[in-house]
């Protein structure tokens, strides 16, 4: 089992293999983005796409075990490798491959790794030296219909009342 970073020029060749898993993973993340955004951002070289691959299998569908999407984020005091998506089947066979992403991050000059994940991932990553430092709390904000109101050369947003 190996983790293979997909070069930008090869992304189109594997996209049909990984797109569904990316779409499904994003369905759990507030649905504020979609797989098209991941594809476009990866094509701009702002995301890195990796596939979890077992080359000993005969069929392509059997070789593919999952996908990882990472992002190098530049912050004021250093770079961070953010694991944006990690998903796949038979996780126990490949979870150790996070070390390959860590090597990549080190080569890119990152000072740390980070990810926001569902609670079950904490146990997996604790076994690889990660620790919980924060909790993410979310609340959906319902947007009211708004209309633009013009008054004396000023533009304001006002709630639309029916």
List each language-model region with its residue ranges.
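Short amphipathic alpha-helix that is part of the acyltransferase structural core
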Residues: 1-33
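Active-site rim helix/loop that mediates acceptor-substrate recognition in acyltransferases
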Residues: 27-51
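Conserved donor-binding loop and adjoining core beta-sheet/short helix segment
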Residues: 44-91
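Accessory recognition modules or surfaces
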Residues: 72, 94-102, 143-152
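Acyl-donor binding region in acyl/amide transferases
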Residues: 76-128
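Active-site/acyl-donor-binding loops of N-acyltransferases
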Residues: 116-119, 123-152
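Long, low-complexity, intrinsically disordered segments
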Residues: 153-162
């Amino acid at each position: 089992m190996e983790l293979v970073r997909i070069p930008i020029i090869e992304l189109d060749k594997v996209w049909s293999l990984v797109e569904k898993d990316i779409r499904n993973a994003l369905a759990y993340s507030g649905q504020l983005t979609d797989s098209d955004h991941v594809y476009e951002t990866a094509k701009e070289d702002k995301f890195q796409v990796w596939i979890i691959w077992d080359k000993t299998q005969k069929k392509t569908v059997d070789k593919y075990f999952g996908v990882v999407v990472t992002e190098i984020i530049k912050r004021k005091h250093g770079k961070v490798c953010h694991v944006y998506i990690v998903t796949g089947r038979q996780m126990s066979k490949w979870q150790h491959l996070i070390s390959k992403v860590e090597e990549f991050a080190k080569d890119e000059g990152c000072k740390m790794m980070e990810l926001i994940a569902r609670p079950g991932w904490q146990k997996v990553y604790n076994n690889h030296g990660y620790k919980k430092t924060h909790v993410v709390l979310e609340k959906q904000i319902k947007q009211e219909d708004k209309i633009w109101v013009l008054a004396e050369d000023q533009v304001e947003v006002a709630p639309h009342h029916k």
